[in-house]
């Protein structure tokens, strides 16, 4: 929906802006990338979720996806910048799938359903 300003669109723009700033201006890329979630969600009061930690975890996944990396596994600890060196090449094709659902952001709506209705459980965009 072009022209309609939503919180999800604003967050997406902030993530891409911060990733671009780090790519062009950073001297220490790994530390600056790890700090992006704290820049986008400052303070200790959550805006969209019940916990600031969950918001930052979701933002970390958005940062990875914005850099062309895949989502981190849920069952093991992995840094936001893990795999960045292998991904930092002149030409890189995306890693399938093209669209991904961030598991920590999902409120467990039914899988494989393409219709969004008033039965949604309150994602940021609704």
Located regions from the model:
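Ferredoxin-type iron-sulfur electron-transfer modules and their immediate structural context
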Residues: 2-126
């Amino acid at each position: 929906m072009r022209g309609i300003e939503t919180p999800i669109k604003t967050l997406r723009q902030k993530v891409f802006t911060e990733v671009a700033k780090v790519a062009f201006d950073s001297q220490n890329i790994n530390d600056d990338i790890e700090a992006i979630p704290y820049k986008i969600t400052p303070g200790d009061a959550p805006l969209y979720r019940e916990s600031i930690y969950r918001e930052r975890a979701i933002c970390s996944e958005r940062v990875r996806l914005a850099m062309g990396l895949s989502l981190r596994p849920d069952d093991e600890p992995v840094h936001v910048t893990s795999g960045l060196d292998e991904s930092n090449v002149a030409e890189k094709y995306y890693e399938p799938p093209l669209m991904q659902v961030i598991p920590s952001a999902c409120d467990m709506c039914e899988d494989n359903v393409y219709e969004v209705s008033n039965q949604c459980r309150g994602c940021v965009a609704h």
